[in-house]
Amino acid sequence: MFGMGFFEILVVLVVAIIFLGPEKFPQAVVDVVKFFRAVKKTLNDAKDTLDKEINIEEIKKETLEYQKLFENKVESLKGVKIEELEDAKVTAENEIKSIQDLMQDYQKSLETNTIPNHLNEEVSNEEALNKEVSSDESPKEVQLATDNNTKEHDKEKENV
């Protein structure tokens, strides 16, 4: 303790006994021990407080790093999402335009009783079947077949 050996401590104790006397010496030892305990406690408290503050500073630094990382990721995601949304918007607009074109084609065909452009092949097949049916069947059966074709056309229109 304090760089003193056993012999030096013994000399200090003998001098203290001679100087203080046998009546005051025990009380002086108790006071010195209390003083060293208080100093030790104060130093430990200071050390703990310093450790906590250092730990808090480290946590603050880590928090700031995570915050910056999070903000960077959010910014990068904003850019990606905007690009993806633009792509989806363009695709949706193209699909809407395609559907509108089909609807206009159907409306024109209904107004003029002509066949829509995209159904020409299907209708020509149906006409060929109708011609075959008309040659083999009575007019009443041909009318039923035509009604069925009209119903199918209406169903397609509803689905679109």
Swiss-Prot record:
One of its GO terms (biological process) is protein transport by the Tat complex. This is Sec-independent protein translocase protein TatB. GO terms for cellular component: TAT protein transport complex. Residues 128-140, 149-160 have a biased composition (Basic and acidic residues). One of its GO terms (molecular function) is protein transmembrane transporter activity. It is a single-pass membrane protein. The Tat system comprises two distinct complexes: a TatABC complex, containing multiple copies of TatA, TatB and TatC subunits, and a separate TatA complex, containing only TatA subunits. Substrates initially bind to the TatABC complex, which probably triggers association of the separate TatA complex to form the active translocon. It is found in: Cell inner membrane.
